[in-house]
Amino acid sequence: MKNIKLIVSDLDGTLLPYGQENLSENVKNRIRRIIECGVTFTVSSGRTYNELFGFLGEFSDRIYFTCCDGALTVKNGKVIYGRRIENGDIGMFFSKRSDDFSFVLHGAFENYSFGNIPSEAEKYNCIPVRNIFDVKEKIFKITSFGGKISLPDYCGIRTHWDGGDNSVSQYVNRYCNKSTALSDLQMRLMLAKYDTAVLGDRGNDVCMVKNAKYSYCIGNGCVELSDKCAFRFDCGELALDDIIGRL
């Protein structure tokens, strides 16, 4: 009987080394091997579903995608779990008046832009909007450019990435993280921490460790994660090899 039935892995810095633009065939072959062994594979990342699909689209009907730092999970092109950003919180972005400020609203499958977004945001293939009423789906992440929002204590969002006053910042639902999304998936699959392995490299992966018996820290970029994980490897490929050896 397999000890590991669910594998949840971060993408950037874990499966995808920093500075590398495409997922290596070696990593894809390991994911393919895991699936062939009958184990459920999930990629869990701060990226949007469309971004993750760009890396792992060939597996889209066989794996789960946990996106936007735990804000939603997608399987077979359908959202099975989600913690949206409420319209009242989105309104703070439309209310900010600055010629340099622009932002992108990320839905599960579409992206909406307000203001003159920089060229780096063109990859999102945004639908321009004039106000919140032009947005036709639930929003799970917001990316701002040329400034950031000062979040009041009572609001329902948190900063996922703080790029500073004049750079890129990202926001998600205050109550989402990778652990809550993983807990939901474990419940759906009727699995427990003893069936689960997680891989990560940064602080936002620390919360997943309590959900898994087998925890892997990739690299040395986060001391807290390294201290809490059961295993440490220099790269994601070696960690996947170790997991495959346990199947």
Predicted regions and their residues:
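Asp-based phosphoryl-transfer active-site loop
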Residues: 3-20, 209
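Active-site metal-binding loops of divalent metal-dependent hydrolases
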Residues: 11, 47, 201-202
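Short active-site oxyanion
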Residues: 38-42, 61-63, 140-142, 194-196, ...
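Short, structured coil segments at secondary-structure junctions
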Residues: 59-61, 69, 152-155, 211-212, ...
